[in-house]
Amino acid sequence: METVVNQIKSKLPENLEGLLDLAYNYWWSWNRRATKLWEKIDPEHWWEYKNPVKLLLDTPEERLKELSKDDDFINLYELVIDQFRHYMNPESTWFSTNYPKWEEPVIYLCMEYGISKSLPIYSGGLGILAGDHIKTASDLGIPLIAIGLLYKHGYFKQEIDKDGKQIEVFPEYNPEEMPIKPLTTEKGKPLLIEVPIEDRIVYARAFEVNVGRVKLYLLDTDVPQNSPDDRTICDYLYNAEIDKRIKQEILLGIGGMRLLRMLGIDPAVIHLNEGHPAFANFQRIAWYMEEGLNFLEALTVVRGTTIFTTHTPVPAGHDKFPIAEVEKRLAKFLEGLPKDEFLNLGREGDQFNMTLLSIRTSSYVNAVSKLHSKVTKEMWRHLWNGVPLDEIPVEGITNGVHTKTWLHNEIKKLVDRYIGRVWRDYAELEGLWYGVERIPDEELWEAHLKAKREFIELIKRKIKERNERLGIEEPLPEIDENALIIGFARRFATYKRATLILTDLERLKKIVNNPERPVYIIFGGKAHPRDEAGKEFLRKVYEVSQMPEFKNKIMVFENYDMGSARAMVAGVDVWLNNPRRPLEASGTSGMKAGLNGVLNLSVYDGWWVEGYNGKNGWVIGDESLEPETEKDNIRDAQSLYNLLENEVIPTYYENRARWIYMMKESIKSIAPRFSTHRMVKEYVDKFYSKALANAILLQRDSFKATREIASWKAKIFNSWDKVEIERIITHDATGVEVIVNLDGLSPEDVKVEIYYGVKAEGYAIEKPYVIELKHPQSLGGNRWLYRYEGNALKNLGHPCWHYAVRVYPYHDKLPHKFLLGLIKWKGFFEL
């Protein structure tokens, strides 16, 4: 790699030397002027690769000398370099202003990152979200360090054959041509970390990726010190082989922590983005045990300082492995450690569940939308058996998108002109975006048409490349930029229902072939290599697109990636999203589209439950939150056709003023609320800051608080089975007495409460009231009498009201009162 840097250095003219540092920092990927600068060097090369390191390597020295004398290029270069230096060395940031004494890093771990097309280590929404998260952490000045894996073949490059069958192509990427650098020792040799897997040590090298002010470290086992098989651990993202998948997750979690230690970084607070990296907490527990803590004490520290984000209710998104397979691959790591206690953290019958491990080792758990929070609580409520759903400690922090990455350049220009550049630092301020109203309709429409033209050119280019590869000789489609274009692009997972719009082909034929109001529908997306049902959906869409009545009206393009996504989310008129509720935990593609004034046509699920306001798009089906089944497909398809025929198409063609009004409404309502600036600030305020406070508390005075809390937990676990609410005695509607047997616990170890309110379904209570019972009287023999007098009991006996008493363990140093998931109940009239 050093030779690559030297190669570039040796041919850069002196007045263009700044291009080297710029090329190795992904800041350029969200800066309009910087991408324009790279494009000026070689437009065709930039279109193909979007990789400044490869661009500089491949550009002849003569061309660089020519540019060094080009006044226009030099002026742009100096402007970009000046912006870059100011960004990297700010006087202050949001974080430094709001948390001036915070220096400890937050460690962020994820299996994939979508930073740019030139770093193909992502497959879909999880990776794109992770990329947007760390870009925003950079913008806000958060001391965040990210860890991932470097995949030799990435995910896969998609080709579609003449029959519509997906072909997975796995190109081999050369790290030396990427904007990444290897970490080296003082002697210039590759820095290697040692990761115990099975009965041996596996070595991994590390690469550093600069994402603005944030460091992303990527691990890879393709080094000569490893066996041929171990060298292939990082060959493929989401390797379907159980053996490789477990090893990848050990490498990410345990290896990631060991890399930090080699770099002298203390992982005081960590954020697990999905369950894949959860073995990181095994390593942290082991290290704390080396410092003299027992297992429960070490777990207390680790759990109190870990954040876990779960992204999907779909079972395929929650890794499970046979526990024997996990034990085999952790054999060397677990030597000398209490094996069963470690494995029990993820044990689910004979399976080891990575999500379960993540939850059991995290104090701060969140889903990625408000609806997904409810779904997640229901999905995992057995871990908090008896705790009311609304009190289960799973927060909803709705996803967002990195505005500077996803806002189209033409829209950026308008926003700069009519709102001011301040949005770049304060994208989450809702009042700011009301300035969109100042944009003249004709200017917004022209900017939108430019985005459409760009996307149309991309589609034609992709179709041409495919035709040439397959030897297909036919004219390219003529796509009218003034016609309505509907876009559908995402993973071809069956629950996303790509074929829903194909339910009634006769009706669809009339919709797309109206000569006065033509409609194009453009599909993009990959099916997982092992998802045969998803591949069949893709084949079905392609098959319909080749029917004479749909030819060049419905189109499918290959290899949907970040580059095509950026063009598509701004270059269509309508963004179609029709998953089966509630399986779309959040979804972010619609946010990106809405940000650009593209109108969402979506099922009421995920983020759209919060985003839809009646003026910024349409809802397919109803606004219910009830789960859907396959039986609802016909209903939703009919709703989709009705909306297209009666609202979407007529508005687009007959009421342009209304359409542009909705575009502005979309931008101003979606841009601030669904920005990662809002999202990441929520993580800092709600989770990171509290986890850091816990880290300080738990490690202070040689882990004094840790030992106290762990000792208390052990006492609770030992006595809880025998704790009992023995009796409830009511005195008309004025008072109640409760007798509780606390076994070996004291009243200070628990809270006893009256819980009451209007009955809802089953035993649920709508908007419950809680009264804590205090000052108990000892009855001897571990039995305590709690009393209450007051008017809260006035509805006692009413058939619509329910009263109960509950008792649960309580410690004021726990992050959540229900962290242990223990609670006992007794209804007032139970016999």
Swiss-Prot record:
Pfam families: DUF3417, Phosphorylase. PROSITE patterns: PHOSPHORYLASE. Optimum temperature is 98 degrees Celsius. One of its GO terms (molecular function) is pyridoxal phosphate binding. It is an enzyme of class 2 (transferase). InterPro entries: Agluc_phsphrylas, Glyco_trans_35, Glycogen/Maltodextrin_Phosph, Glycogen_Phosphorylase, Glycogen_phosphorylase_DUF3417, Pyridoxal_P_attach_site. It catalyses: [(1->4)-alpha-D-glucosyl](n) + phosphate = [(1->4)-alpha-D-glucosyl](n-1) + alpha-D-glucose 1-phosphate. Induction: Expressed constitutively. Keywords: Allosteric enzyme, Carbohydrate metabolism, Glycosyltransferase, Maltose metabolism, Pyridoxal phosphate, Transferase. The keyword Transferase applies. Its cofactor is pyridoxal 5'-phosphate. The modification N6-(pyridoxal phosphate)lysine is found at K592. PANTHER family: GLYCOGEN PHOSPHORYLASE. Phosphorylase is an important allosteric enzyme in carbohydrate metabolism. Catalyzes the phospholytic cleavage of maltodextrins with a minimal chain length of five glucose residues to yield glucose-1-phosphate. Low activity with tetraose and no activity with triose and maltose. Long maltodextrins (8 to 15 glucose units), amylose and starch are not as good substrates as maltoheptaose. Trimer (at 25 degrees Celsius). Belongs to the glycogen phosphorylase family. NCBIfam families: maldex_phorlase_Thcocales, more_P_ylases. This is Maltodextrin phosphorylase. It comes from Thermococcus litoralis (strain ATCC 51850 / DSM 5473 / JCM 8560 / NS-C). The lineage of its organism: Archaea, Methanobacteriati, Methanobacteriota, Thermococci, Thermococcales.
